[in-house]
Amino acid sequence: MQVAIPETMKAVVIEDGKAVVKEGIPIPELEEGFVLIKTLAVAGNPTDWAHIDYKIGPQGSILGCDAAGQIVKLGPAVNPKDFSIGDYIYGFIHGSSVRFPSNGAFAEYSAISTVVAYKSPNELKFLGEDVLPAGPVRSLEGVATIPVSLTTAGLVLTYNLGLDLKWEPSTPQRKGPILLWGGATAVGQSLIQLANKLNGFTKIIVVASRKHEKLLKEYGADELFDYHDIDVVEQIKHKYNNISYLVDCVANQDTLQQVYKCAADKQDATIVELKNLTEENVKKENRRQNVTIDIIRLYSIGGHEVPFGNITLPADSEARKAAIKFIKFINPKINDGQIRHIPVRVYKNGLCDVPHILKDIKYGKNSGEKLVAVLN
């Protein structure tokens, strides 16, 4: 089946330090193993505005990492038994990359790598609502929230913390609790669900606003501490001085210091950071030999070096293998309704709403929800 594809498209690109909607952008070329989708829904992430503000993305490059749509063209080496024109898929794209600046999620057409793509067995449609509560992943608005957040969460638990991909085992895989700082973030909500379903830890402790407590406990969180409390770290340490597994889902200088203080006093502890924060970012007087900081970089799953600002991220074949294995494992669970998308706020003016979405994320107007633009 052939689908008519235009020569150019509308996309959101970096121009003069801003996200700008432009016409006449060339359709991205397809590398080996990629497919072209007609983009139907996209979601914003903090990394999108960071690529602009921190000058990570090149001028003119297409922004966006979360895309969902319908396949219109198969690239080289794509098995038509696995992916066909007309299939509905969703996946992670490194938008505004130095290596592939002509491809990003925030465009009418996007190229997605099939080895790290999620696939829906059914036709996906728009629900048409302004707001969606957390629920089964069965709409275009819902699937657009999944790729970055869920894939990151899966890698944190399996690649960084070493959990096995076992669904609802009878006993916890680790003998201690896990602390998730930023439990209501998109990655945090995914982590709670996965940590619960994989029975990874004896307890799932989250730090988030009290207003999110009901939902986070529905996902599987055991206990919530409110980050608004001035003594939140002291509260946690008073009750739990043995936390060996910690994830900083907010990932800034302040939260790193707080999470670090929550780590176990004596036994070895691992903190997973979602940004490039290391021991060097911890105040010298607080550093301890028993605490290790590990970093998860979703950009490393592409199978090649990634120029990223003033550094180059090395190719990480093990992270790539872990991502492929996780997606293959979790995709049927999503299709069965065993993983829920987080609450969604929908923007209905297509790509024209993307600059607004990025500002809303940058200034913290997305508490506990994912911001999605639909392209009708």
From Swiss-Prot:
Pfam families the UniProt entry points to: ADH_N, ADH_zinc_N
SUPFAM superfamilies named in the record: GroES-like, NAD(P)-binding Rossmann-fold domains
Gene3D superfamilies referenced in this protein's UniProt entry, alphabetically: Medium-chain alcohol dehydrogenases, catalytic domain, NAD(P)-binding Rossmann-like Domain
Superkingdom, taxonomy of origin: Eukaryota
InterPro entries per the UniProt record, alphabetical: ADH-like_C (IPR013149), ADH-like_N (IPR013154), GroES-like_sf (IPR011032), NAD(P)-bd_dom_sf (IPR036291), PKS_ER (IPR020843), Trans-enoyl_RdTase-like (IPR047122)
The family this protein is said to belong to: Belongs to the YCR102c/YLR460c/YNL134c family.
Full protein name: Uncharacterized protein YLR460C
